[in-house]
């Protein structure tokens, strides 16, 4: 199990080291527009899971939404501190 901060650190490392075959690297290379579309897709899946699926399914969908949100932040050069200042 990872914390939100640990996931961000792992994704940031992948963005820097660019391991071959990394899905995160491929997503970053696809650009902000594609990442934004993916984030919207995941948000819709969270909504549907909240209304029609189990708690476990909802938790999984939220985890995917958080992953894509973090990848988008990294693509834009933002950090979690940038977000935390707005909470």
Swiss-Prot record:
Name the chemical reaction catalysed here.
1-(5-phospho-beta-D-ribosyl)-ATP + H2O = 1-(5-phospho-beta-D-ribosyl)-5'-AMP + diphosphate + H(+)
What's any one GO cellular component for it?
Answer: cytoplasm
**Which enzyme type, at the first EC level?**
hydrolase
Q: Which CDD domains match?
A: NTP-PPase_HisE
Annotated GO molecular function terms are: ATP binding; phosphoribosyl-ATP diphosphatase activity
InterPro entries xref list = HisE, PRib-ATP_PPHydrolase-like
Gene Ontology terms: biological process:
L-histidine biosynthetic process
Question: Is Repeat tagged as a keyword?
Answer: no
Looking up Pfam families in the UniProt record yields: PRA-PH (PF01503)
Note the SUPFAM superfamilies from the entry: all-alpha NTP pyrophosphatases
- Keywords on this record? Amino-acid biosynthesis, ATP-binding, Cytoplasm, Histidine biosynthesis, Hydrolase, Nucleotide-binding
Enzyme Commission code(s) on record: 3.6.1.31
Q: Where does the protein end up?
A: Cytoplasm
Give the record's family classification: Belongs to the PRA-PH family.
Q: Do you know which HAMAP family this protein is assigned to? A: HisE
Supply the name of the protein: Phosphoribosyl-ATP pyrophosphatase
Encoding gene per record: hisE
């Amino acid at each position: 199990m990872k914390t939100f901060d640990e996931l961000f650190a792992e994704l940031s490392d992948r963005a820097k080291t660019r391991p071959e075959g990394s899905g995160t690297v491929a997503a970053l290379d696809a650009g902000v527009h594609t990442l934004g579309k993916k984030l919207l897709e995941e948000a819709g899946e969270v909504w549907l899971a909240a209304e029609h699926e189990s708690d476990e399914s909802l938790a999984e969908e939220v985890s995917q939404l958080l992953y894509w949100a973090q990848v988008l932040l990294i693509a834009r050069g933002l950090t979690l501190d940038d977000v935390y200042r707005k909470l």
